[in-house]
């Protein structure tokens, strides 16, 4: 019943010195500020899933002193966070490390007694994170159940009495009445000792994890046989799963990958266990495995792609008083974001700073942000990053900005047109591992400066930070008159190549267009919606050859988001959302951009790339986009839905909502009934049907909520899948947390079919 020992043995780490050191624990200095350093004891728990941290706070619960390794985004060595950069410069880098969490909680900055201790912690945690990520769903399930068993075994005798079984079921997030729990307990207690041990616990585990719905699906495929032959598996892959490449080769590869029985594998058979392993794998995911890599044509002009884009990237919270942080840039880049916003203002000591102008948000150095971008720009994707500069700096500090851009970004920075690319926008492929600037520019594509150029020139100032047109917003921030002109130095201007910010002058026919291909306009969400309503097709055509950036309305001081879908339907590429604000809009956004390998660029459908298109999402007509499909979604069951309320006695009452996002007439929502007191294995067996007219623009969102009769339902998890990435047949939908991180074992089991 020792899940940690099982984990170490499974991965050959039982004698690993790093993990042995973590299991023993060590005294570390926790750093919060220049005046706050406290010695605390940290120790890896025996389950190899959690870290215990000593706390001196009075009345702190034991649970609050634990954090899960699953919640760790990364472990950094040295002065690699703002905290250690500011508050631990006096300590050698080889004694410092940081634990960065997936959600927006504070980073844990630590100082170790010696470099060897740092190595143990950094390498040990990385090994657990890497090995946990490589575990299949069955191993994750076993590891999780063993952890719950260990927690429930209060007296640590490796036996389970009836009370401990009840506690165990609560850990699993399932409420069972006493008589049913007692019935299972007696069935497993073969030794009649009023406790379960060894094989009895294994029997109990098997009874608990048996899935009748998998048995039913297996029987559909295998008939009365105990195993699936290659021929029957091919038939299942063709007729149920609708796999395009269904054939003996695919069937054999699935048997080879997922069948745990060596005997069955040798006989080219798949058992029920192998069938479940397949359905829980990436091959059985409702999101297409083929779309987990870059598969689209990346050689088209930038304007032909949707670009993952962040608004006010520097903010971690709201836009009036919240903290600014380089960590916010790192998080956005790690989520595949390719367009970041830098709101630049004069700072002390001739160093430009970034913050939300005229407000009380905290300030960070421009140069520190550039270093973070340099280090993380291409970790999640090799495709270009666009830095959207909101420049409010004096001429002197603009020159400092230009110096930092060259010195810090070096050859990553695109500071001149690509050879031969002077008549249309370059492609993402041509711009691989390049950083582009979006901002004001003097003159045209080629530099206007040089030795004989002017030292500075006026340009119109239409950026959004100066815009804050909503009176309600203005009343909440420091009064600052808007200036119509901004002086711009050539050193900075010359670095803007393919993304020159201009005022939008209206739609023209391509032959008489007043906007050059390298010029782009920004629109507030309200203005963009107005243009889509009044001139929808003109906006679509404009966006075939030009980039358009959309940003949230000025009244969204709480950093709330708008729906990106309408903007995408109009062909707008750089639809900027507040990445720091979780919610349905961000769910749909990240769902769209998990397509094409999560590289941050998604090719628009052909009818949004055609300069002669007649498409208008607000006035649909017949055309290549009109391809009505009937979508049937059968919500069968859920698995290991996480507790929302961490109260020990709390059990979730889950319900599933299926939403369609797309053009107006396709938007729809359906929901299941509520299953009470069962987050471990709820069964719904509920079928929904949707008719989708423009599937190329549709996304399907699966959301699970915890029903509450007296207040708003609590969010449990969700997954949003672009229509063209949705797989048919029996599939598992792997749920994400509100911050977009994968719940390790939480899934929905569904059956999907699409018909003309």
Curated annotation (Swiss-Prot):
InterPro entries named in the record: C2_dom (IPR000008), C2_domain_sf (IPR035892), EF-hand-dom_pair (IPR011992), EF_Hand_1_Ca_BS (IPR018247), EF_hand_dom (IPR002048), PH-like_dom_sf (IPR011993), PH_domain (IPR001849), PI-PLC_fam (IPR001192)
Expression by tissue: Highly expressed in brain, heart, lung, epididymis and testis. Detected at lower levels in kidney and skeletal muscle.
Enzyme class label: hydrolase
EC number: 3.1.4.11
Residues engaged in binding Ca(2+) 3: 312, 341, 343, 390
Keywords: Calcium, Glycoprotein, Hydrolase, Lipid degradation, Lipid metabolism, Metal-binding, Phosphoprotein, Repeat, Transducer
Start and end residues of each PI-PLC Y-box domain: 492-609
Phosphoserine PTM sites in chain numbering: 460
The UniProt record lists the keyword Phosphoprotein: yes
Quaternary structure note: Interacts with TGM2.
Protein name per its UniProtKB record: 1-phosphatidylinositol 4,5-bisphosphate phosphodiesterase delta-1
Species per Swiss-Prot/TrEMBL record: Mus musculus (Mouse)
